[in-house]
Amino acid sequence: MSFIHLRVASAFSMKYGTTQPGDLVEQAREYAMPALALTDRATLSGAIRFAKACVANGVAPIIGINLPIEITVSDKKTPEQRVTVLAHGDGGWAHLVRLLTGLHINKGEGSTRITLELLEKFSAHSTHLHLLHGPQSPLSYELAAHHPERALDLFNATREFFADHAIECVSHLVAGNGPGSTAHAARSLVFARDHDIDAVITNAVRMRSRSDGPVADLLDCARQLVPLNYRHIERRNAEGYLKSSQEMTLVATEIARAAGEATPRALLKTTREWAERALLSPARDIGLGGIHLPEPHIVGATSQSSMRTLLRSRVEAGIHWRYNANADVKAARIRLDDELATVASLGYESYF
């Protein structure tokens, strides 16, 4: 069974991802993967380019966003906490766009981020989306500190605001017990099993291949405006790349065994199920190939016919403001009738 990556950052994650969306899709096609996710940091800027590349390469798109989250009072030494929100394949794209728009508009003087207050405000959209609690999530840091009770409290704080939740197990084969290690991924898996929460495996991808590691280091330091130095870079090795299905199966096996499970079958099965629920149709869900115009209510109308009436009244008012002579007004009306007929035949009233 082919693996499907659920968390992938492209170069549209400014000063973080190393690879253009199209190149990531081409790599997924070379691996014979049926689908690929794009989950850039706080932006959907690369989503359309990604979806077009998916169509060209015969790969199904999955789209989400990776966002900072503030649901606890963080110590200054604690790294920025983040979660990943995924659109599902039944209207999820529209809700994802509206949620991100709402977060941007209400960010105040800080950066775009999720808070409990904003989740309450935009729950009409967030409750149609899926949430991944990954190694940078508040829950994950509590697990790393061996506080499973606090981790559960944090999970419950966001439970009602999303359609589904999953614990994201990530191992970059880092030494020790912290995020990125197999030990931490296994602890996350055990936590999910203990509390009947779905668990999925991702590779928290930010590179196409291991050779992109030095580029990732430069981006880390440029993002922080600090000199290039080991203490300023995020990665501890070059494992955060777009791995093949075989490579991900090996990682899943290591995590599962460390968690006391004989095989990674359940972990891989749940990951595949989550991917299948998040598959988007480029045409139906995203609207590729279609024409997108403002809805009637945006321009103060209630229907297509009322938009025609509104447009005619506005342009006729413009005629009388611009022309005084009866002959000029008459000629303008004849021209206006022809042009409005063309606009009506195309359904473009709201554009004008």
Stretches found by the model and what they are:
Residues 1-35, 41-198, 213-223, 266-269, ...:
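Extended substrate/RNA-proximal surfaces in nucleic-acid metabolism proteins
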Residues 161, 247-249:
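Eukaryotic intrinsically disordered, low-complexity regulatory linkers and tails enriched in Ser/Thr/Pro
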Residues 167, 199-201, 281-286:
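Acidic/polar loop patches that form or flank catalytic/metal-binding clefts of enzymes
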Residues 5-11, 32-37, 141, 166-175, ...:
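Glycine- and acidic
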Residues 1-6, 192, 257-352:
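Non-catalytic structural connector segments
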Residues 208-244:
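Flexible glycine/proline-rich, aromatic-decorated loop/lid segments
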Residues 244-246, 271:
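Mobile "lid/hinge" segments at catalytic clefts and subdomain interfaces of large enzymes
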Residues 197-210:
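Short acidic/histidine-rich active-site segments
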